């Protein structure tokens, strides 16, 4: 093994298997692009993004770790969200939760 090397099984791996998901339509109403990372609590993203925030509480983008989705000004797109796992507590971000979900 080489330091830092990652060994994986052959075939494909399903991300977030068995976790609750939901789809939301999101529109960027601002005049600047907004980029949202893979593990950002979607409920607390930039206020220029217009969508059903209550439905996004406790969810993040259902994309690979370390990636992001970019919303251009005026763009509307449908995104898939996945439920947060672990202790299901959220701290930081915009400070809108600061505790258990």
Curated annotation (Swiss-Prot):
Its EC number is 3.5.1.5. It is found in: Cytoplasm. One of its GO terms (molecular function) is urease activity. This is Urease subunit beta. The gene is ureB. The keyword Cytoplasm applies. GO terms for cellular component: urease complex. It comes from Burkholderia cenocepacia (strain ATCC BAA-245 / DSM 16553 / LMG 16656 / NCTC 13227 / J2315 / CF5610) (Burkholderia cepacia (strain J2315)). Pathway: Nitrogen metabolism; urea degradation; CO(2) and NH(3) from urea (urease route): step 1/1. The lineage of its organism: Bacteria, Pseudomonadati, Pseudomonadota, Betaproteobacteria, Burkholderiales. GO terms for biological process: urea catabolic process. Heterotrimer of UreA (gamma), UreB (beta) and UreC (alpha) subunits. Three heterotrimers associate to form the active enzyme. Belongs to the urease beta subunit family. The keyword Nucleotide-binding does not apply. Keywords: Cytoplasm, Hydrolase. It catalyses: urea + 2 H2O + H(+) = hydrogencarbonate + 2 NH4(+). It is an enzyme of class 3 (hydrolase).
């Amino acid at each position: 093994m080489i330091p830092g090397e990652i060994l994986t099984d052959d075939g494909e791996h399903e991300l977030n298997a068995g976790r609750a998901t939901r789809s939301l339509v999101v529109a960027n109403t601002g005049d600047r692009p907004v980029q949202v990372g893979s593990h950002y609590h979607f409920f607390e993203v930039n206020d220029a993004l217009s969508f059903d925030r209550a439905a996004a509480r406790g969810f993040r983008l259902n994309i690979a770790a370390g990636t992001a989705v970019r919303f251009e000004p005026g763009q509307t797109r449908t995104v898939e969200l996945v439920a947060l796992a672990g202790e299901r507590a959220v701290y930081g971000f915009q400070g809108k939760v600061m505790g258990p979900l």
